[in-house]
Amino acid sequence: MKILILNAGSSSQKSCLYDFKEKNFLDNPVEPIWKADIDWTLATGQGILTVKANGIKQKITLNSDDHHHGIAKMLGTLVEGKTKVIQHLSDISIVGHRVVHGGTDYSEATLITPDVKATIARLIPLAPTHNPSHLEGIEAIEQVLGNIPQVAVFDTAFHSQMPLEASVYPIPYEWLDKGIRRYGFHGTSHKYCAEKASQLLNKPLTHLKLITCHLGNGCSLAAIKNGISIDTTMGFTPLEGLMMGTRSGSIDPAILIYLMREYDFTFEQLNEMLNQESGLKGVSGISADLRAIFEAINQGNDRAQLALDMYLHRLRSQIGSMLASLGGLDALIFTAGIGENAAIVREKACQGFSFLGLKLDLEKNANSPVNIDISTPDSTVRILVIHTQEDWAIAQECCHWLNK
């Protein structure tokens, strides 16, 4: 069984192909046999396609920024040239798409139909940089592969069972009818990490209280009780919550009113500043990359130190919020680029909860841990580092759908 995964961004297209040969593959993640990325940000009117397969890496210039053309070219590398891994595109059994926003319409992976496409299009105002790209990917597959089954896996789906007190904003109730509510994001990653934690702890997911910390360029936490997300830090959009690489996270909304009234800021300017010029980048004045922040701190840069201190303060504060929603904690989980690789972030985050009996093993924490428990034997709470595999999780959802 061959499953193709597409993960479209506003200016990129990431894809991979899994070849499932073993009956027990669902419990044992495997590496894709083919990976491809398209970057449309390097030059106007063109893109760069990078393909990895058969032990080689190939770069191809796309002389067009037409996304349909780019995806068709990308799919061609599956069946021709040095990156050929299958005989025919018809060898692909199913295609899985990561879709950022499914609103309240979908609580699980869903076969893509005209109605589903219409819903994704209707939700474009809530995810203007992502949902249009998802539709382009879906339609490109339709053009090249015809009626092959396509499944949408929504970032918002895992959070769809949040209780009303966690999902409704304290604003005029009528706004709820306009779709203004907390949706949550990174759901595929949070769900995968919760299930992996259940395996690592050898305990049923239905008996666990977990906090998953997805810390990358975008950051969010989820409070997971008995396998269900009951609270999360991102809300109506991925801008709410934690301080992130270039996003502000939660701020006083009156700041925006003030800037518009006193300084004539437009909503386009505010949107750009809050999403692209804030967070670690905005405070440090250096970069959204923590590695660059650490380097600047070592050189005595006070703004870089402030950016890190703010990031950690807000992280600890939001972990505390998730802890209160859960009313207890079995495991604190770190994942994604920062969560998996920044030992100092894990250390400082855990220090804030030593009063609970949570104890970090500093040696384990420093040794690039992956999919292991880094707490001390006498810690009252387990601390896990889990390598998130969103593409793999989407492939699992596709397989479950095929086996229905």
UniProtKB/Swiss-Prot annotation:
Pathway: Metabolic intermediate biosynthesis; acetyl-CoA biosynthesis; acetyl-CoA from acetate: step 1/2. CDD domains: ASKHA_NBD_AcK_PK (cd24010). GO terms for cellular component: cytoplasm. Its EC number is 2.7.2.1. ATP binds at K14, H214, L215, G216, N217, G218, D289, L290, R291, G337, I338, G339, E340, N341. Disulfide bonds: none annotated. It catalyses: acetate + ATP = acetyl phosphate + ADP. Its cofactor is Mg(2+); Mn(2+). Pfam families: Acetate_kinase. The keyword Metal-binding applies. It is found in: Cytoplasm. The record marks H186, R247 as: Transition state stabilizer. Its main location: cytoplasm. InterPro entries: Ac/propionate_kinase, Aliphatic_acid_kin_short-chain, Aliphatic_acid_kinase_CS, ATPase_NBD. One of its GO terms (biological process) is acetate metabolic process. Keywords: ATP-binding, Cytoplasm, Kinase, Magnesium, Metal-binding, Nucleotide-binding, Transferase. Mg(2+) binds at N7, E390. Mg(2+). Can also accept Mn(2+). Catalyzes the formation of acetyl phosphate from acetate and ATP. Can also catalyze the reverse reaction. Homodimer. Belongs to the acetokinase family. This is Acetate kinase. It comes from Rippkaea orientalis (strain PCC 8801 / RF-1) (Cyanothece sp. (strain PCC 8801)).
